[in-house]
């Protein structure tokens, strides 16, 4: 028999009626999450103890982690992608890049490959941002929210959208 024990909660007994795709990202002995409460939270991996929380930006559940684990990425409700330093003792933002999308709430996980962060938006948009925060490109593919990204054995990147469309990203 397996018993699950809660390690942490945000202290609220309220339900959040919004997309709630909370994906834990683990780096350097820490767990990073963004929940529907729109706060970036960092927990100690071993104990579950809350190390810090930050609500300086209206964060959403789109998150990712750099290949080397040094940067945690999250999207904001203002259509930005932010990167924070995972080794810092407190919240330390490295950069925040405007994707040019305006109000944004889609919770498709970010995909990180070869130093590029890929994110999908609520209106059929996909953007690529360099690990230094440079917006490389942003394209409108369709009209619905992005679901997820997957890399094929040949290295090509694929993404899907809620309206059933599938796209290959070169």
How would you label these PLM feature ranges?
Residues 125-128, 136-137:
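Short, positively charged, low-complexity/disordered linker segments
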Residues 6-14, 49-54, 92-100, 134-139:
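A short beta-strand motif characteristic of beta-propeller blades
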Residues 1-3:
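Short, small-residue-biased leader/transition segments that mark boundaries at the very start
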Residues 10-40, 54-82, 101-126, 143-167:
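Repeat-blade elements of multi-bladed beta-propeller folds
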Residues 44-47, 86-89, 130-134, 170:
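Short loop/turn segments that connect beta-strands within beta-propeller blades
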């Amino acid at each position: 028999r397996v018993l699950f024990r809660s390690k942490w909660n945000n202290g609220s007994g309220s339900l959040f009626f919004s997309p709630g795709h909370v994906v834990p990202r683990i780096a350097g002995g820490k767990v990073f999450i963004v929940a529907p409460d729109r706060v970036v939270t960092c927990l100690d991996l071993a104990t579950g103890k809350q190390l810090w929380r930050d609500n300086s930006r209206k964060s959403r559940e789109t998150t990712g982690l750099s290949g080397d684990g040094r940067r945690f990425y999250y999207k904001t409700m203002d259509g930005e992608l932010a990167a924070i330093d995972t080794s810092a003792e407190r919240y330390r933002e490295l950069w925040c890049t405007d994707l040019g999308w305006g109000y944004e709430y889609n919770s498709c996980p970010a995909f990180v490959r070869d130093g590029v962060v890929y994110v999908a938006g609520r209106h059929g948009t996909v953007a690529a941002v360099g690990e230094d925060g440079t917006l490389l490109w942003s394209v409108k593919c369709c009209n619905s929210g992005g679901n997820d990204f997957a890399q094929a054995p040949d290295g090509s990147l694929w993404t899907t959208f809620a309206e059933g469309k599938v796209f290959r990203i070169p």
